[in-house]
Amino acid sequence: MSSYPTPVIILIGPTASGKTELAIKIAEYFKTSIHNIDSRQIYKFMDIGTAKPSKDQQKKIKHFLIDIEEPINQINVQQFQKIAQKSIKREINQDNLPFLVGGSGLYMNSITKGFFIPDIPPQNNLRIQLEELGQKKCWELLNNCDPLSTKNISFADRIRTIRALEVFYVTGKPLSTLKVQNPPNWKVLELGLDRDNLKERILQRTKNIFLSGIIEETNHLISKYGFDLPILETIGYREAKDVLKNHSTIDKAIELTTTKTIQFAKRQKTWFRNKNNPIWLNNKNLLKDAIIKIESFLS
């Protein structure tokens, strides 16, 4: 294998910024596939609430790292890192241009920068104590001991909040400060997508998600795995679950989901600027600007 660094293209951006649509156009132009770096799209049966690429989009362009596990089987950052790196290596060995797309900064950096993620088994006693405290208190604890991680973890994401607290309490080190270990021999171009009208896009996408059937999708997940499925505590699904319980209305669920998503997108943008420092694309002509930058990078 060549000792020269392998070129790898990355497209990052906050939720609802239009990554999927732009990524497909880029992949079509460069005749390559897409590796989805997303902490929820890896799970089966969660298509609407995660805004997963449609079946038609997946037929048009091959997508990796989508629907790789059932939601009852939680995948942590370390497990995802291993799965993703293996998939990307396979593409490199076939002389394909690796193209990574996602909004999860921690997951992306674990792959591209080689962050060492400690292999800490679930701490059952600790988890019981944390779950008794409730998500609000756990997120506040995490924000106190590891504020950088909360910039990339939604306030409603109980799974990743508890996992980050486990890492801190077991190792004594915040998850966000874990050092790079054996970074891959890649030459990486990071492109950033950030829309001026992001709040409006988030509101529209949230409406579309509820109109498209997130409540029915949530009901299906509940019937298959039960009300206590942890992933149902994440943004969108939690609000849909409250509607099913008659604790909320659809209008209130849309409003709350929109508010939480806007807050999460703000934290994503802060993470990208602090941890990634991408080249931001020109919003007036995204595809043209992306192609110019990628071709220059590859030449």
Curated annotation (Swiss-Prot):
Cofactor or coenzyme needed: Mg(2+)
Reactions the enzyme catalyzes: adenosine(37) in tRNA + dimethylallyl diphosphate = N(6)-dimethylallyladenosine(37) in tRNA + diphosphate
Binding residues annotated for ATP, in chain numbering: G13, P14, T15, A16, S17, G18, K19, T20
GO molecular-function term, one example from the UniProt record: tRNA dimethylallyltransferase activity
Site (Interaction with substrate tRNA): S104
Binding residues annotated for substrate, in chain numbering: T15, A16, S17, G18, K19, T20
Highest taxon, organism lineage: Bacteria
GO term, biological process aspect, one: tRNA modification
Enzyme Commission number(s) of this protein: 2.5.1.75
SUPFAM superfamilies: P-loop containing nucleoside triphosphate hydrolases
Gene3D superfamilies membership: 1.10.20.140, P-loop containing nucleotide triphosphate hydrolases (3.40.50.300)
Keyword annotations of the record: ATP-binding, Magnesium, Nucleotide-binding, Transferase, tRNA processing
Annotated stretches, region: Interaction with substrate tRNA: 38-41
Classification via InterPro entries: Dimethylallyltransferase (IPR039657), IPT (IPR018022), P-loop_NTPase (IPR027417)
PANTHER family (alphabetical): TRNA DIMETHYLALLYLTRANSFERASE
Subunit structure of this chain's protein: Monomer.
Function summary: Catalyzes the transfer of a dimethylallyl group onto the adenine at position 37 in tRNAs that read codons beginning with uridine, leading to the formation of N6-(dimethylallyl)adenosine (i(6)A).
Family per record: Belongs to the IPP transferase family.
Protein name: tRNA dimethylallyltransferase
Source organism (scientific name): Prochlorococcus marinus (strain MIT 9215)
